[in-house]
Amino acid sequence: MENLSILEQAAKSTSKPSPDAVVAALLEAEKNARKNKIRYSFEQLIGNWQLCFITGTKKTRQKAGIVLGAGRYIPQWIAKIQITYAAEPVAEGEENSETGRVENSVQVGAIVLTLSGPTKFLVNKNILAFDFTRITVKLLGKTVYQGFIRGGEAREAEF
């Protein structure tokens, strides 16, 4: 349970644990979830999440060399990165379908870039699948561009 307190401190405290301690806590939490076959639901993910720490895969870290290291905090004065999961509206009397929408927003100064698209929680695999199909660019709070990306309209219909 110490790993959970390290992760909570990394997310909420001004005195942050070392990046190595956070990576070790993340790996331990992941190992524990697999060992205990912890199952999640889409409902547990719904809401706004702020990204405050990043890691790469071992392969990515090897490619990046010492520049990336094992993990890094994202300074809030550089960028604010937020991801939002929302459930699709369900008609009265219908069962929740484990589908919804995702929005990933990156704010740097007065510019906000948002990628969004459909999500589907694959219960048997305990995985959230998603596809970014739309982009919105805002400058000083005003939308300057909004549209589908990479054949997004067709991909969204197929999802």
Model regions: which residues?
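Soluble ligand-binding/transfer domains with enclosed cavities or grooves
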Residues: 2-159
